Amino acid sequence: METKQALEKADIIFSDNAAKKVSTLIEEEKNENLHLRVYITGGGCSGFSYGFNFDETYKEGDSSVENNGVQLVVDPMSYQYLIGATVDYLEDLQGARFIIHNPNAKTTCGCGSSFSV
């Protein structure tokens, strides 16, 4: 049985820019069942790495936040490292990408894709 918990707005912030980009990508895929899953794995030069993928399912214990009609979903293990973080979408000279501003990260690598706590 699937259970999903709605996050308080302050738990993890899903920025308007990120939500709009996710909405655009879902429209391009023509699959309204998709949501953005954010997760943390071991690895990277600082110990932990962020990951993003599109998913159609919710897993036991997932938490989610909605913005612009789309869902951001986080598993229970990743959630503990993302409390207070902002998931954003940025387009600049380095390219276009989803990024996480994480107040729990003590150090980050130069590219910003890994961190330590």
Swiss-Prot record:
Pfam family, one: Fe-S_biosyn
Entries under InterPro entries matching the protein: FeS_biogenesis, FeS_cluster_insertion, FeS_cluster_insertion_CS, FeS_cluster_insertion_RrpA, HesB-like_dom_sf
Residues annotated for iron-sulfur cluster binding in this entry: C45, C109, C111
Gene Ontology biological process: iron-sulfur cluster assembly
Superkingdom, taxonomy of origin: Bacteria
Cofactor(s), names only, from the UniProt record: iron-sulfur cluster
PROSITE patterns reported in the protein's UniProt record: HESB (PS01152)
Free-text cofactor note: Binds 1 iron-sulfur cluster per subunit.
Signal peptide limits: none
Database matches in SUPFAM superfamilies: HesB-like domain (SSF89360)
Function: Required for insertion of 4Fe-4S clusters for at least IspG.
Family label: Belongs to the HesB/IscA family.
Subunit and interaction comment: Homodimer.
Record's protein name: Iron-sulfur cluster insertion protein ErpA
Organism: Ruthia magnifica subsp. Calyptogena magnifica
